[in-house]
């Protein structure tokens, strides 16, 4: 099933140069826009103390997710779909390990941590994470399961970092603590 879904999505690559440019943009440049936009949003927060708290939780969650993804890739290497001769590769990845997707893990941790503070922004960042993951499958550098696993791992880490922060530093006012 993983391979079937991959081939269906990857078959969209190479059909139209403009579509390929958009895929490349969402897979490689769009993530920087999301990070920059989030940084501006959190740094210019009207309540500086809450903005600093939100920034600390979100950055910690994203960094922890990135570290976990790197660790899994190191200990459980899994080749990218680009090793198949039928794969249409639109760009070259940084490394040859695909599981889990570091991008999916990182960008799933952001909305998971943000959700508890800024639900509307978290929704848009979750949509951004979906676009990034889809583009990385279409671009031929990730299997669908790599992306799905990244979303699950990132979501758990994002929520977990929020939970740990609340346990040690926050007032237990959120409904999950009641």
Regions found by a protein language model. Give the residues of each.
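Alpha-helical transmembrane spans of integral membrane proteins, capturing the lipid-embedded, hydrophobic core
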Residues: 29, 33, 58-66, 70, ...
């Amino acid at each position: 099933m993983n391979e079937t879904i991959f081939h269906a999505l990857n078959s969209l690559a190479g059909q139209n140069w403009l579509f390929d440019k958009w895929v490349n943009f969402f897979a490689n440049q769009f993530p920087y826009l999301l990070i920059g936009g989030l940084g501006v949003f959190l740094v210019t927060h009207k309540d500086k103390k809450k903005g600093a708290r939100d920034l600390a939780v979100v950055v910690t969650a994203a960094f922890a997710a990135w570290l976990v993804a790197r660790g899994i890739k190191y200990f459980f290497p899994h080749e990218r779909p680009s090793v198949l001769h039928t794969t249409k590769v639109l760009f070259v990845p940084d490394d040859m390990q695909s599981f889990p997707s570091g991008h999916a893990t990182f960008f799933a941790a952001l909305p998971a941590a943000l959700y508890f503070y800024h639900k509307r922004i978290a929704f848009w960042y979750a949509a951004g994470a979906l676009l990034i993951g889809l583009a990385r499958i279409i671009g031929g550098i990730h299997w669908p399961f790599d992306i799905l696993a990244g979303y699950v791992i990132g979501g758990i880490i994002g929520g977990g970092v929020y939970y740990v922060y609340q346990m040690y530093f926050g007032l237990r006012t959120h409904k999950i603590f009641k």
